A protein has these predicted regions:
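Histidine- and/or cysteine-centered catalytic micro-motif in compact active-site loops
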Residues: 315, 362, 400
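Beta-strand scaffold of nucleotide-dependent catalytic cores
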Residues: 129, 241, 309-314, 385, ...
Length: 444
């Protein structure tokens, strides 16, 4: 067991995140017999490199992301490139990143700059949250609630009030909406009539003529109907997400999805019939009891169904999830298997004409891996790119929404958060609006 001692350091959180890439929580603590002492003398990355090399020597492990513990490697590479530095060289030499990861980051950066470009100074992305799901998945810790029609109507009324306010404020501040994203939760938990009402309100509040991408997450295929898809199409939605996570029925049952593989096939068929231009599909590597063959088969089915965007996630076991309660150390099991799953998936997708367009990392992710978005036909998820590069203001409406106003002169963001509990959001909607008046609008 190890014990870490730090001197001249007030906040050790980023170093602890690096330590967790090597050691399980049960392998270090105040009672550890092997003591590793560190004294901060200037550059935090020097200290992180020392920790990385010490733990590599002691454990025999060399995590491929090196000392990077942040969730936005592509943003870092962009900043390096803008300063005239070689991102790949810096990632490998200073951040100790494996060459395969450095190449992936640089490929994505090159694609983003060629296809998405930099956002206009007056552009804005908008997120609208619907915090309801049919069920809560085994691995999930998002603030979402099981569908309750009695709760939905009061929530939609409060959300509508925030939308109406935001529409006027966006116009007054001179913003132009570039992307619009409905997330959750599962927005298609709403009825077709509720969706129509909500999207009509959005169309009235905001000028959407210049919107480049309009996404609605329809993640749970059991919530999708042709009537709902027609509503989305009628309102200009051009991208949806249908997220099976796995195409193995045993896995779906185990993780609490409560839909069938057949539901996924039917959802794709309906979406194509309705004329939705881009369908994203999420798959998760590392789900309980899945093999590399299971994951490969799921990916092949999604490719065959014609998904224009495919996002490969690595299972992230959050503290508040039921899976964490069942197995505290699940993240540390089968790390090589998850890496094998993702490596094979990347090769297969590239071989089938898909290119990686977006990447982010999460805390609590299994095996020190990452989440990567792939696209074909040059239709990347633009909203996802903008959120990760953090060079544009993002207005987030609804319970749990965290707005971010961007100050380009200083290259920094300020956050303005809504409360996460939807019942408190309803009760305090006027306060949520007031927060945006004081913290978001009028600050450009």
């Amino acid at each position: 067991m190890y014990r870490f001692e730090f001197s001249n350091i007030d906040n050790t959180s980023q170093y602890e995140e690096l330590i967790k890439e090597f050691l399980q929580p049960s392998q270090y603590g105040n009672e550890g017999e092997t003591i590793l002492s560190y004294d901060f003398r200037g550059d935090k990355n020097d200290l992180k490199r020392q920790i990385y090399r010490d733990l590599s020597k002691l454990t025999g492990m060399s995590p491929k992301w090196g000392i990077l513990t942040g969730i936005r490697p592509v943003k870092l590479a962009a900043e390096l490139q803008d300063r005239g530095e070689d991102p790949k060289k810096v990632l490998m030499e200073q951040y100790l990143t494996d060459e395969t990861k450095a190449d992936l980051v640089c490929d994505i950066l090159e694609y983003q700059r060629a296809k998405a470009g930099k956002p206009a100074p007056d552009s804005l992305s908008i997120y609208i949250g619907i915090p309801f799901c049919p069920t809560r998945c085994l691995y999930c810790s998002f603030t979402s609630n099981q569908v309750d029609q009695d709760a939905m109507e009061p929530y939609l009324q409060a959300l509508g009030k925030e939308i109406d306010f935001a529409g006027e404020a966006v116009k007054a501040d001179g913003y132009k909406v570039e992307t619009l994203y409905f997330g959750g939760g599962t927005p298609t938990s709403l009825t077709a009539e509720q969706l129509d009402r909500l999207l009509s309100r959005v169309s009235t509040a905001f000028a959407l003529g210049g919107v480049k991408e309009y996404t609605v997450e329809a993640g749970r295929p059991d919530t999708i109907t042709y009537e709902k898809l027609q509503v989305l199409q009628d309102h200009g939605v051009d991208r949806i997400s249908i997220n099976p996570q796995s195409m193995k029925q045993k896995t779906l049952d185990l993780i609490g999805r409560r839909h069938t593989v057949e539901d996924v096939y039917e959802a794709f068929e309906m979406a194509n019939k309705a004329g939705i231009e881009v369908i994203n599909a999420d798959l998760i590597a590392g789900l309980p009891e899945e093999t590399a063959e299971d994951f490969a088969n799921s990916l092949e089915e999604i490719i065959r169904l014609g998904a224009g965007n495919i996002t490969l996630h690595t299972l992230a076991v959050k503290r508040a999830s039921r899976l964490k309660e069942m197995d505290e150390n699940f993240n540390y099991r089968d790390e090589e298997l998850r890496e094998q799953m993702l490596t094979a998936a990347h090769e297969r997708l590239r071989g089938r004409g898909y290119v990686p367009y977006n990447l982010y990392r999460q805390k609590h992710t299994s095996g020190n891996t990452e989440n990567t978005g792939f696209c074909n036909d040059d239709r990347p998820g633009l909203y996802n790119i903008r959120i990760m590069e953090e060079a544009q203001s993002n207005l987030a409406l609804g319970a749990g929404g965290i707005s971010k106003i961007y100050f380009p002169e200083e290259n920094r963001l300020e956050r303005v958060a809504n409360v996460s509990n939807y019942e408190i959001y309803i009760d305090r909607i006027d306060e949520m609006i007031d927060r945006k008046i004081k913290g978001f609008f009028g600050n450009r």
